[in-house]
Curated annotation (Swiss-Prot):
Protein family: Belongs to the HAD-like hydrolase superfamily. CbbY/CbbZ/Gph/YieH family.
Designated name of the protein: Phosphoglycolate phosphatase, plasmid
Assembly behavior: Homotrimer.
Active site: 14
Cofactor names: Mg(2+)
GO process terms (BP): DNA repair; glycolate biosynthetic process; reductive pentose-phosphate cycle
Amino acid sequence: MATVSLPCTAVLIDLDGTLVDCAPDIVEAANRMLADLGSPALPFGTVAGFIGRGVPNLVRRVLETAQLAPRVDATDAVAMFHRHYADTNGRLGSVFPGVEAGLAALRRQGYRLACVTNKPRALAVPLLALTGLSQYLEVLVAGDSIAQMKPDPEPLRHACNLLDVDAAQGVLVGDSAVDVAAARAAGIPVCLVRYGYAGPGGPAALGADALVDSLEALPALLTPARLAPAA
C-alpha cells in the first residue's frame, strides 16, 4: 500500500481512535455508569470494543454485556453515561503520536481539514479544544450535527459541503469498519491508521485503500485533486 496515491482536496478525519485515544475516558465513564447501577465494572477491552457507533449504541451494548438490559431504561443510562463522560472527557486519554505533526503538514500543503465523528458535539468540541487539535480543523461534523451518523455517507458529504468542496474530492481517514463503510457509501477513498479501535483482525482486514502507521505518513499518500474544467 505504500505506493497508493489518493487524490483529494479535503481530508475528513475521524476523532476517537484516529486523532485521540479516547478509550480510557469512555471506559471510565461507562464503568462509573455501571457502578451507579450497582453492577461490576467491565474489562477495558470489552468496552473499548464498543466504540465507534455512537453513545446510544455503546451504552446499549454495555447494558447487554452487564446483563442489565432490558430492566434498565436505556435513555436513563445514556443520560447517566453523558454525565460521567462530561467529567472524564479528555482527562485520561491522549493525542496519538504523530497526529499534530501530520495535521500541521496537511495544512501547510493546502488541504482542507474536517473532523467527522459520531461523538456528540457537546463532547467533541471541548475534547478538540483541550487537546489543541481544533486549531488545525476548519469544520466539525459531530454525531448530532445532522440526522445521520457514520456509516451513513451523509456526514462526509455534509463536511465537504461546509468546506465548499465537491464530495468526490474528499478522502476519509479513520480507524474502523464504520469509517470504511461510510467512505464506500460516499464513493470516496479511505485510509485507516494501524492503531485505534479496528477490532478483531485489525485494520488490514477491513479493505481500506491505504494504511498508515501515523498521520505523519499521510501527506505522502495524498495528491491534490484537480477540478475538471467547466463545461
